[in-house]
Amino acid sequence: DDLVGQEHIIDILKGAVAASRTGSDSQEMTHAWVFTGPPGSGRSSAAVAFAQALICPNQGCGACNECQSAATGGHPDVEVIRTEGLSIKVEEIRELLTRVAWAPSMGGWRVVVMEDADRLTESAANALLKAIEEPGTRTVWLLCAPTLQDVLPTIRSRCRHLQLRTPSIE
């Protein structure tokens, strides 16, 4: 409901969730995604909704305990990274990688939503790159940035890109 005017994105994410449930080897589900779009486009909301759908037994109902705890940051298999500072430092990424190295504890996926991937320092981006190149089993990375060019080329080349639009006023 929060993704007004993003039907094209919703359809892609629904296909990915369905593929993740069946274990399909299709290209619909992948371990790393980049959500881009201007401020107000809902890129972080889309990433969190996708995380909810991946861990929800009902494919993202929004009402169950799993969805609610993912939305509020309390689900053990969903890590939402928000930064208050100007950058995300390598120490923060190394700590994150330690936390997400384990298999999911409750659901089928461990999901990391990074709201400000454009704020990664070069060394932090390189540390993250290693994790994206060699993903943990059942780990999904959801990176958010204003534009694709804001993400290190070596990272974006390993991610599926979703471009959100600014919704119309209507």
Each language-model region and where it sits:
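Conserved D-loop-proximal element of ABC-family nucleotide-binding domains
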Residues: V90, T121-S123, P153
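P-loop/Walker A NTP-binding region and its immediately flanking N-terminal helices
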Residues: D1-D118, V140
